[in-house]
Structures are given as C-alpha cells and as structure tokens.
C-alpha cells in the first residue's frame, strides 16, 4: 500500500486511521453543506414568491374510476418545454410560467396518453384539481414482488439473484423488464443487487453486511408498498445520491394512502399457493391524524417444488400527525413479516435425468411418513420508522427520519462427523462414479429410478446415531445445524430540497448507519445422538493426535454441545457509515442538467468470541478497525428537442468499501484479511433517446459500466487439499455494456404493443489475484492468479426480449407476451482457472507426439478433462409465452373489485436452464463426477389475484 500520510484517532478505545487529505475534504464538504442548508432554509422561509407577472400551475393525476393517485407520470408543458413528474400522491406543480395558452401532454407506462388545453393566468395559481387518466393494463406488477424474489434467493441466501422494483417505473423498458424478465433471473444491466438502493420514508434500508435490501422484510405487505418515488439508474434524486442500478423511496406515511379498506386474496403454484391481505387506511382526518394497518400472510403445505413448504404472516401499523396546514408531519410505522420456508437445491444433470424431473430437489427425504427438508430458512425482520417532514412552502422540504430493524436469519443444513456423506446426489452415489463396472452402474441406476436413494435417508441417519449411542461414545455422527446471520441496524437520514430560483433546485442529505451482525451456528437437531463434540472434522483428519489444532474454541477445549448451543464459530461485525451528498438541478427551455457528489466514511471491525485452534492468535477478540473513505460524483444532461423528443446523457464515478464477507479471507475462524485492501470502483456512462408521441413512446439507450478493484469470494471443497476452502478474488475488473430498447405503440385506444429488449455483454476484464484459506488450517494465504479474463458473468441472460400485445375494452385487460432469451452462462468457479491445477496436462501437440499406449491415452484424458473444466458452459437459448387477463368492476360509493390472472411459461417448457454453478472439485481422470449444477425454469405456472376496495 502507498505510504500516504494518515491521522490516528482514538475514539472510545477504538483505533481509527484516516487518510489526511480525504478527511480534510470530508470536513470541508460537511461545513459547506451545513452552511448552505441553513442559509437556504432561511431564504426559503422568507421568500416563496418568485415573481408578480408569472403564473403557477398545480394538479393531481388520478386513475379513472377510483381516484387513486398515479405516481411517476410525466406531465409535459409543450409550449414551455418543461417536464414534470408526479410525486408519491400523484401531484405535480411548477411556477414562473408565462401567461397564455398551453398544452399539457400526460403520459405514463400502462396508461392512455392525454392532451389537455389550458390557459395560464397572469399571476396567481391555476389549480387543475384531479385529472383522471385511463389504465390500459391491469397487470399488477407490484403484487408479484414477493412471488418473484422468494424463489430467486440463492441457496446460501447471501445474494438475491434478480432485480425487482417495488415502485413501478414510468420507463417503458424498466416497467416491463422488472417482472417480464424475472423468470430468466434478469438483473438490471447485469448489476448485482447491491447497486440498487432502497429507502423507506427516506431511510436507507440496504443493509451494510450484504449491501442489499431484504425483500422478505416487506413480504405480503404489497398494499402498503405501492407509493413512492423511483429514480431510474443514477438520475437526479431528492431523497438519495442514488446508485447505478436505480433507487427507490417507498412512502409508508399513512396520510398518503387512499381512505378505505382493501381485502386481497391470491393463489399461485410457485413457492406458496395462497396469499391473503387485509388493510385499512383512515386517510387524513380533519384533526390532522392518519392511521394505517395491514395483516397478511402466505402459505403452502408443499410448494410446486417437491419437499418445500412456506409459512408466513405479515403485519403493519402506522400513525401520522400533521399540523399547521401540513407544514409539519410526524409519522411512525412498524411492520414485520416472519417467514419459515424450505429451500430447493440444485443438482447435476445425471441426477435430474435419473429422476426424470428438472426441478429435482435433493434437500428432502422421508421421516416417519412425512417429507422433511434439511435446508429450512427462518427469518424475521421487525422494523420501526420514525419520520419528520417540514415543508414551510411548496418549494422546500426537509425530511429527517430514524429507522431501526433487527433481522433474525437462520438457515439449516446437514452436518456429519466420521460418517458417509448423507446427500443423495453425492458423486459416489451416482452411476457415473462406477465407470468400468457395468453391473454397479445398472444397480445404482435402478436404485435412483425407483426412488430408493434419490432423497435423504433420515431413518439411516437416526439409526447410525442410535448405534453410536449404544456401542460408541454417543456423539453425533449426523446432525442438523442452523447457520445464523442476525443483524441489528439503525439508520438516521436527513434530506433537504429547495428551489433556489426559477431554474435551479438544490438537494442535499446526510446519513449515519450502525450495524451489529452476529455470525454463529447452533445445534438444531442431534438426530437422536446424545451430544456433539465441538471440533473440526477436517483438522482432526489432517492433524491426528493434535488436540489443540482441532478445537473450534481453545477457551473451552473438548466441549460437548447440545441442541440450542452455539458451536463451530461465533463472531461479530461492527459497521459504521457516515455520508453526505449534495446535488443541483438546472432546468431551462432546451437544456436540463444535474450534477452531484457524495463522500462517505465507513469502518468495519470483527470481534471473535471463540479462539480457534487453527488460528489461536487471530481468531479471538476484537481485530483491527478497517476504515474506508469513498467519493462519488455524477452528472447528467437532457436536450429537449421539443416536448416529445429528448436526448439524455448520464455519467458517474463511484467507490464503495468491500463487503465484510469479501474482506476477511476466512471470517468464521480468523481476523486475517486479503493482501490488498481497496475500495471497489466503477465508472458508468449512458446515452438515451426518449420519445413520447400520441401513438408511440419509449426509450432507446446505450450503457457502458466498468468495475475495478472489486472483490468476490467462492467457497468449496478442495480435492487437492482435502478440505473446505474460501477462495477470495481481489483486484477484479468487470465490464457491463449494452443496449436497451423499450417501445410502446398504441394504434388505437384499445390496443397497444410492447417491444422490449436488451442485448449486452457482462464479462470479466482481467485475471485477478486470488487467495485461498482452508478451514482446517492447512492452506494459509495461498495466492495465485485466476485466469478469468473474457469469461462471462454467470447466471444472467445477456440477450433478452419480449413482444407484448395488450388489449383493453370496458375495463377488461388482456395481455400476451412472447419472450426470447440467450447468452446465459454458468457461474464460473475460480479454482478451475488456476494454472497449478493443470501442471500435469500436456498440450495437444505434445500428446500427438507420444507413442500409442496407456500413457498417451491417460494424457489425452487429462487434456480433455482440462478443456471440459475450463470451458464456460453456455445455456441453450429459447422462448416462452405468457398470458394475463384482468377486470376492474366499479361499484357505487367508490367501491371496486379487481381481478387479474397471469400464466407464465404457457408452453410448459421445463428444460430451460436459468442458472447454475461449476463445482469446485477437480478430478482430471473422472471429470464427469463433478459436473455443473443447474437450476431449471418451472413449468407452466399461474398467479391469480382478486381484491375488493371499499
């Protein structure tokens, strides 16, 4: 690392190191923001009228029939060439307008366009009241949030594999791709979910440990998460600096909800079969109070994937008080969505072929006549938010909020000690393992096809432990553990927005977040054993007779643990972040532009509660505090050819601290970190043509994003070292580039067509360094370059498209989509790209020079295995078809019944691979034993939703 001057500061016993130049910059920026915000607030309090000879305009866009506010609709003033967007209550407003005739162009994705002729007065305010627009689609994308995301969380639960917006975007491409492409595990521009920011009532809810928003925290709360703002990509925002994947602010303030109640009942054949919600909102009462409440849940005794189940209940309560004509508002809301669900596992192709089912799930087996799943997730994320909004005039808003939540997250899994592998698809139990033994191959094929060994044999596990209780020492050979990743997090955010003059708007904000993450595992079920010995099974094998190295906790050697006890590992993460950002927007007749910057201070520390025998000096107690100062900048410009045609360009440079999981090489057992500690960086640029005519509207965009100094981590069993290893890549470079097209053509008021697609490349752009560390202590900081350059980012299609036909008549809605996809690749394992694993492999030219015989055959087999194991698998392209139908029935007294049903994969294609990963085990003589593991698209599936509003 460079020898730059640093400051050392002692704060309550903790040691922090800061780069001097960056700290000075942070202090100067904070002082400037504080002074500017104070001055601007004072100015806004005493000046709220900008001119005597100009007029102002305000109005509210509502849905025809029920009067519900429509968020994110574009309102264009054609003569003034000014573009407005409706806020979370459907309202738009602007000032300093020249008097005379004007034409309003109203457009929103999923709504019929509308033109309104108005006359702007000289001075005063023209209030247009409620302006109804007609929906052209009833496909309730927001209702699908829980359906999409719960299936797409990977096996470890560390990352969410798709991008799904809670707030529907007004952008034609984003509105359709978020749901329509979710079945293919689409991610916005291929970005990880941590590049999308989620806020609730102005509070940041991207957790600091994983960097993502926890969608399960709002499961079955769909009716309370519809309102809010969405910023497409890294555009101008008044609640956040934003991120390259976009940002959302879910508005849960009770006063923003439609007065009345709603009862919703949904059915599906996916991860759950039944969902119900009942909510009631008081609206804003005459005394300034507003209240909201919701109770919901989701359930499946067995989901569409065999051996899975789903149990969930959700709740929300909120209250708000406004006074002084809405100048002041204080709101409080609390919600939660505890869930217990069984997971599906991936498997190799041979196992899938043997059972004849693409959704084969190796995670379950029979026990006492009932199906039992070994991998069960239990999660609960109770949340409370207190928010204060001060709006002294129409041009100024100051929002401050405090959010607190605690996430209890655990996932169970089988563990074993001195016993045969209990997983049914373990490579030794597959016919391929018995190469050259035709009888054994036929025998194991028969066992698989008759279902005798295709699932977990729970009875055998219990019997093995029972025998050891009688004739052995009574310790568990097989058991179920629960791996816990609990999180307590508190966040404080304050944002300020004001209009400085006719053309300039200023937004600024500050935020602080504290996170305490508890990482440990407990004994969930001893499966009939008396106890479990808390030692490392790999270390005991590799260090026989060494009673020190094998201990998981030297402070309590030879410890026996029982159900509910913590064992194996136990440590904490302490994370602090402080950030400040400022942004300015300029609006002129032909040009709009914005620019902004953000600076952040982040600290991370690990505290080990066990002294591990493999790392006795670096596992126990508090480790070093790692400090990162990051800086972001963004800018964008819009050229308004006229009110219907725009050209936009956006650019940004960002940096962010590494995730805790990436920074520590083996966090379960040591405080050691990667050799090169850097903040990851990215630079982004995009160019868009946006158009909105009476018949056609949409966007065509180009984007290019490059990442460098990034990190990634994989964990797998290493056959060479015969132990479990963590493999961390650092100094990683990636490129995401492509084109996006979203076009809606409405030849008539009843018929419109969607043309949505993206063609992109997401790939690794260098050969990063990697460092491996084993859990048994045999491998310590083993470094080698991984040959990843030009491999594709796995698990996300790089070419996607859909053509949709939407028909609307008398509040009946019918949609048909034909989807195409391609260029989807397996997630590559870095260990397969280490040259040291293939030191015995000869080139084809060298093999051709060898004499015929066993030696040449063996060399050819190794060479073929090398090519197989280093070639990235590309999944087959394909197409699917989706159908949806809906109906709105309006009743007297603003009552309403909604019905919508959708069917995905109407052609029932079950052979479509949507994702998967390469195994980390390498065997050059028998590579077929360690084939890739895949996920497949479910066959035909449906979602039915009915709701009654009163």
Where are these regions (language model features)?
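Transmembrane beta-barrel wall of Gram-negative outer-membrane proteins
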Residues: 56, 267-300, 304-344, 376, ...
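Short acidic/polar hinge/loop motifs at secondary-structure boundaries
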Residues: 165, 172-174, 203-234, 251-253, ...
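Surface-exposed extracellular loop regions of Gram-negative outer-membrane beta-barrel proteins
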Residues: 340, 346-347, 550, 555-560, ...
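Signature of Gram-negative outer-membrane beta-barrel scaffolds
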Residues: 479, 505-642, 769
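Gram-negative outer-membrane beta-barrel transporters
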Residues: 704-706, 727-832, 947-949
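C-terminal beta-signal and adjacent terminal beta-strands/loops
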Residues: 753, 820-861, 887-950
């Amino acid at each position: 690392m460079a020898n730059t001057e640093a400051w050392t500061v002692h704060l309550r016993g903790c040691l922090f190191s800061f780069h001097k130049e960056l700290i000075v910059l942070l202090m100067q920026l904070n002082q400037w923001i504080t002074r500017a915000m104070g001055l601007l607030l004072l100015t806004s309090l005493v000046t709220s009228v900008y001119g005597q000879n100009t007029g102002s305009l305000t109005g509210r866009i509502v849905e025809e029939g029920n009067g519900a506010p429509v968020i994110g609709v574009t309102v264009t003033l054609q003569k003034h060439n000014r573009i407005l967007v409706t806020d979370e209550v459907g309202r738009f407003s602007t000032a300093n307008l020249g008097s005379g005739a004007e034409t309003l162009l109203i457009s929103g994705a999923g709504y019929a366009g509308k033109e309104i002729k108005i006359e702007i007065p000289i001075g005063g305010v023209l209030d247009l009241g409620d302006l109804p627009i007609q929906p052209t689609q009833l496909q309730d994308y927001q209702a699908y949030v829980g359906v999409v995301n719960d299936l797409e969380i990977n096996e470890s639960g560390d990352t969410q594999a798709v991008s799904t917006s809670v707030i529907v975007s007004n952008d034609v491409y984003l509105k359709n791709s978020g749901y329509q492409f979710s079945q293919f595990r689409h991610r916005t521009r291929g970005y990880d979910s941590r590049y999308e920011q989620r806020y609730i009532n102005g509070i940041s809810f991207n957790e600091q440990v994983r960097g993502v928003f926890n969608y399960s925290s709002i499961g079955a709360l769909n009716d309370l998460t519809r309102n809010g703002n969405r910023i497409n990509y890294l555009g101008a925002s008044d609640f956040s600096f934003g991120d390259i994947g976009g940002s959302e602010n879910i508005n849960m303030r009770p006063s923003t909800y439609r007065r009345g109640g709603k009862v919703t009942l949904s059915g599906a054949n996916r991860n759950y079969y039944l969902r119900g919600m009942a909510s009631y909102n008081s609206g804003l009462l005459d005394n300034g109070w507003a209240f909201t409440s919701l109770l919901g849940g989701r359930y499946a005794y067995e989901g569409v994937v065999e051996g899975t189940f789903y149990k969930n209940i959700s709740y929300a309560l909120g209250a708000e008080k406004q006074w002084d004509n809405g100048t002041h508002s204080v709101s409080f809301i609390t919600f939660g969505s505890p869930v217990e669900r069984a997971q599906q596992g991936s498997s190799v192709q041979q196992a899938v072929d043997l059972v004849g089912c693409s959704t084969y799930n190796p995670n379950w087996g029979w026990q006492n006549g009932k199906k039992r799943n070994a991998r069960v997730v239990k999660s609960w994320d109770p949340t409370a938010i207190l928010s204060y909004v001060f709006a002294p005039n129409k041009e100024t808003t100051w929002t401050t909020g405090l959010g607190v939540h605690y996430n209890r997250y655990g996932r169970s899994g089988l563990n074993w000690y001195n016993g045969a592998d209990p997983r049914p698809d373990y490579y030794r139990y597959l016919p391929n393992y018995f190469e050259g033994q035709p009888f054994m191959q036929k025998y194991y094929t028969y066992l698989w096809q008759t279902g005798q060994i295709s699932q977990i044999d729970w009875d055998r596990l219990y019997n093995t432990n029972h025998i050891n209780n009688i004739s052995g020492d009574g310790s568990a050979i097989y058991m179920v553990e629960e791996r816990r990743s609990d999180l307590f997090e508190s966040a404080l955010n304050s944002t300020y927005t004001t209009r400085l003059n006719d053309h300039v708007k200023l937004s600024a904000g500050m935020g602080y977040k504290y996170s305490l993450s508890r990482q440990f595992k407990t004994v969930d079920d001893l499966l009939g054993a008396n106890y479990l010995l808390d030692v490392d099974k790999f270390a005991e094998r590799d260090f026989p007779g060494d009673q020190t190295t094998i201990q998981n906790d030297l402070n309590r050697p030879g410890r026996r643990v029982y159900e509910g006890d913590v064992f194996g590992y136990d440590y904490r993460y302490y994370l602090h972040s402080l950030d400040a950002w400022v942004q300015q927007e300029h609006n002129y007749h032909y040009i709009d532009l914005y620019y902004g910057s953000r600076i952040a201070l982040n600290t991370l520390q690990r505290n080990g509660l066990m002294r591990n025998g493999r790392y006795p000096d670096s596992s126990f107690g508090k480790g070093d505090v790692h400090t990162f100062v990051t800086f972001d900048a963004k800018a964008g410009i819009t050229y308004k050819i006229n009110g219907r045609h725009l050209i936009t360009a956006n650019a940004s440079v960002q940096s962010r601290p590494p995730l805790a999981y990436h920074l520590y090489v083996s966090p379960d057992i040591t405080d050691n970190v990667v050799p090169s500690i850097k903040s990851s960086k990215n630079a982004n640029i995009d160019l868009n043509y946006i158009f909105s005519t009476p018949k056609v509207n949409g966007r065509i965009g180009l984007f290019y994003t490059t990442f460098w100094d990034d990190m990634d981590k994989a964990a797998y069993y290493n056959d060479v070292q015969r132990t479990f290893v963590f493999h961390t890549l650092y100094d990683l470079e990636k490129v995401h580039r492509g084109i996006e097209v979203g076009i809606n053509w409405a030849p008539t008021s009843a018929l419109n067509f969607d043309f949505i697609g993206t063609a992109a490349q997401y790939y690794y752009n260098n050969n990063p360094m990697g460092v491996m560390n084993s859990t048994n202590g045999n491998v310590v900081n083993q470094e080698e370059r991984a040959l990843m350059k030009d491999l594709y980012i796995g698990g996300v299609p790089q070419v996607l498209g859909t053509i949709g036909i939407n028909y609307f008549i008398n509040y009946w809605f019918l949609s048909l989509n034909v989807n195409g996809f391609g260029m989807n690749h397996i997630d590559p394992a870095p260990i397969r790209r280490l040259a040291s694993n293939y030191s015995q492999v000869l080139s084809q030219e060298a093999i051709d020079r060898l004499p015929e015989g066993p030696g040449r055959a063996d060399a050819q087999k190794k060479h073929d295995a090398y090519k197989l194991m280093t070639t990235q698998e590309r999944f087959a392209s394909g197409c699917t078809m989706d159908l949806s139908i809906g109906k709105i029935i309006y009743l007297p007294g603003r009552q309403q019944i909604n019905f919508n049903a959708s069917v995905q994969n109407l052609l029932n294609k079950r052979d479509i691979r949507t994702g998967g990963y390469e195994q980390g085990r390498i065997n050059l003589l028998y590579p077929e034993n360690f084939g890739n593991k895949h996920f497949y698209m479910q066959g035909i599936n449906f979602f039915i939703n009915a709701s009654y509003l009163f």
